[in-house]
Design a protein with these regions (language model features):
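N-terminal, polar/charged subdomain of small-to-medium soluble alpha/beta proteins
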Residues: 1-99
Length: 99
């Protein structure tokens, strides 16, 4: 699976890119029909609190899959997004096997 990681208004982080690649690599091994992923990291301010946003778009057969999450750091946000995408991929897999 091809993974592209972008940092919006942030400095590039090799460790976060490696973390995203590791997590998405696990999804890619579980669902070998996933073609690629676009990961976006962004830090935002809401009510004087820092919120860390992770968005991931997956390319796979059928409509594109998307999930995003805010959390107290990028690792937690990424883990939540991966869980959401795993659920979406399971549903897609079930639909694909029905045909």
């Amino acid at each position: 699976m091809k993974v592209e990681v972008q940092f919006v208004d942030l400095d590039h982080s090799e460790s976060m890119e490696a973390f995203a690649n590791e997590k998405l690599g696990k999804l890619g091994r579980k669902y070998d029909w996933v073609i690629g992923a676009n990961v976006f990291y962004k830090k935002e301010q809401h009510n004087n609190e820092e919120n860390y946003l992770c968005e991931i778009r997956l390319s796979a057969p059928g409509p594109q899959l998307f999930a995003h999450e805010y959390d107290t750091n990028f690792e937690k946000a990424t883990n939540q997004v991966i869980k959401q995408l795993d659920v979406q991929l399971e549903k897609r897999k079930a639909k694909m096997s029905d045909h």
